[in-house]
């Protein structure tokens, strides 16, 4: 299982929010590209990038910082990017810039036809980010909670051909409160594609618990505030995940390797 460092971008800086609220922001670095190199040097095998301004604006807002990150790490490890991606032209531009996987969130929920077209146009490169509060999907940078059930939508999008589902529990994101294991496991069991857990991954206990569920289809865990504030040592976490992964027989999670 992969432990995936998150680099959330706001106004060109590497930040973390609490529960997705733009005002609850902590700036961790004014040089996101250097931060990307740091995680690469620590042994990261994938980076999770989010254009926070873009998620709220509905269009890319941190493209320069994203290009700098891609330039800094080259093709050494894959990247996955979400936030404000609402049309095929933006997807094509990011892929041309060197991003490996595109994460579609709000647009997948509001205009599923767009997601279907994206999967057809860029097979193997499209993921869906489902961000939930109390089991219901949220959109527009988490500012609006819909009536859509997470599992129902994920199964629909799986049929479209998405590569993986990134599941975030909004109530736990940036709170260092632990992963919503029950909801993450329920989602993974309902799908045949990999699930990447996010929101609240903050300790080695979280990593261990998720690794135990890897055979159910949980292929990765995104972590942010914990590795920036030091409550979770990234390198130790990935080493633990590697050790535990050799002891399990996971469902097809080869997308992440």
Swiss-Prot record:
GO cellular component: cytoplasm
Active-site annotation: 8 (proton acceptor), 131 (proton donor)
Keywords of the record: Amino-acid biosynthesis, Cytoplasm, Histidine biosynthesis, Isomerase
Catalytic class of the enzyme: isomerase
Coiled-coil zones: none
Matching Pfam families: His_biosynth
Family stated for the protein in its record: Belongs to the HisA/HisF family.
EC number(s) given by UniProt: 5.3.1.16
Biological source species: Nitrosospira multiformis (strain ATCC 25196 / NCIMB 11849 / C 71)
Biological process annotations from GO: L-histidine biosynthetic process; L-tryptophan biosynthetic process
Pathway: Amino-acid biosynthesis; L-histidine biosynthesis; L-histidine from 5-phospho-alpha-D-ribose 1-diphosphate: step 4/9
Subcellular location: Cytoplasm
Name recorded for this polypeptide: 1-(5-phosphoribosyl)-5-[(5-phosphoribosylamino)methylideneamino] imidazole-4-carboxamide isomerase
CDD domains attached to this UniProt entry: HisA (cd04732)
Catalyses which reaction(s): 1-(5-phospho-beta-D-ribosyl)-5-[(5-phospho-beta-D-ribosylamino)methylideneamino]imidazole-4-carboxamide = 5-[(5-phospho-1-deoxy-D-ribulos-1-ylimino)methylamino]-1-(5-phospho-beta-D-ribosyl)imidazole-4-carboxamide
């Amino acid at each position: 299982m992969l432990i995936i460092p998150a680099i959330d971008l706001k106004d060109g800086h590497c930040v973390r929010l609490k529960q997705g609220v733009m005002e609850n922001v902590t700036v961790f670095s004014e040089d996101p590209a250097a931060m990307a190199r740091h995680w690469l040097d620590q042994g990261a095998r994938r980076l999770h990038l989010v254009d926070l301004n873009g998620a709220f604006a509905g269009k890319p807002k941190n493209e320069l910082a994203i290009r700098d990150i891609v330039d800094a790490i080259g093709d050494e490890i894959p990247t996955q990017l979400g936030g404000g991606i609402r049309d095929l032209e933006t997807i094509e531009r990011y892929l041309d810039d060197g991003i490996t996987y595109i994460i579609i969130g709000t647009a997948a929920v509001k205009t599923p036809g767009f997601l279907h077209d994206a999967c057809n146009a860029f097979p193997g490169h499209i993921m869906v980010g489902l961000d939930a509060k109390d089991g219901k999907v949220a959109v527009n940078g988490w500012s609006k909670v819909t009536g859509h059930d997470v599992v129902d939508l994920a199964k629909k999008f799986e049929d479209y051909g998405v590569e993986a589902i990134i599941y975030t529990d909004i109530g736990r994101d940036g709170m260092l409160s632990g992963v919503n294991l029950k909801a993450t496991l329920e989602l993974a069991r309902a799908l045949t594609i990999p699930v990447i857990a996010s929101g609240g991954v903050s300790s080695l206990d979280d990593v261990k618990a998720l690794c135990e569920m890897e055979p159910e289809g949980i292929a990765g865990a995104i972590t942010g505030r914990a590795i920036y504030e030091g409550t979770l040592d990234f390198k130790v976490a990935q080493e633990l995940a590697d050790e535990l992964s050799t002891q399990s027989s996971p469902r097809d999670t080869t997308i992440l390797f």
